[in-house]
Regions:
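Residues lining hydrophobic/aromatic ligand-binding pockets adjacent to catalytic sites
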Residues: 1
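Thiotemplate assembly-line natural product biosynthesis machinery
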Residues: 6-17
């Protein structure tokens, strides 16, 4: 296991200089974040490329600018706007989740504020909840999606099957240990960006990676072989 020192700072510095800052859902440059926009984008980005999501996100925000608008919409309206994006269960969960969030706001006066609260919303898992809290609520949230797992598996050269429960637990523990208490929102965006643009699945750009000097898979092996997925 490489040393953790300055890991997050290297990631944040890279993001500031080389990361993407023009995605329509990004909140790190805004004075007040839009929790709804973060949630919507996180659901749309599940298993879907950024370039595909952008026009769908923009159409959704134009049609349903607030969570109240989305909750009040007919399912047919939502389904029509989602058409072509795939994984339609996400759209159903999003629509049902919007109704839950509106109900939560009615009772508390605000959006869910914690990871635990967000995980009660339909279709929101642990990593999505962490992303929403970190980037939308601007609290402390940990993400460990596919991009992050790939980065960490290579950096720490985790040789166990990524599909094993113990490996998943190890990755989550590592993600939590490396996430800075402050700026976890910008760090979350940076980690997802690093995985999507540099530490890619098939052709990682290791020479451009800010953590390549500490990356065990890059220094000792072939990053392409990580994360490990054993054939059953």
């Amino acid at each position: 296991m490489p040393k953790n020192s300055h890991f997050s700072q290297k990631i944040l510095t890279w993001f500031e200089i080389s990361g993407r800052h023009d995605l329509p859902w990004q909140q790190h440059k805004k004075e007040q974040s839009d929790i709804y926009a973060v949630w919507l984008s996180e659901i749309m980005l599940q298993q879907t490329q950024v370039s595909t999501v952008i026009p769908y996100f923009q159409r959704f925000i134009a049609k349903f600018p607030t969570v109240i608008d989305l909750a009040a919409a007919d399912w047919d309206e939502v389904a029509n706007l989602w058409a072509g994006l795939g994984y339609y269960a996400r759209a159903k969960n999003l629509h049902q989740g919007a109704k839950q969030v509106v109900d939560f706001i009615k009772h508390t006066g605000n959006f869910p504020q914690s990871v635990d609260q967000w995980q009660t919303i339909k279709g929101v898992g642990q990593s999505t909840a962490g992303a929403i809290v970190a980037m939308g609520v601007r609290g402390f949230g940990v993400i460990c999606d596919g991009n992050v797992k790939r980065v960490l598996s290579r950096w720490a050269m985790i040789s166990d099957d990524i599909n094993k429960t113990a490996t998943q637990k190890q990755l989550w523990q590592l993600a939590q240990a490396l996430t800075p208490k402050h700026d976890s929102g910008k760090y979350a965006q940076a980690m997802m960006d690093l995985g999507a643009t540099i530490c890619t699945k098939n052709r990682p750009k290791c020479t451009l990676c800010p953590i390549s000097a500490d990356c065990q898979a890059y220094q000792k092996a072939n990053p392409i072989n990580y994360p490990v997925k054993n054939k059953s």
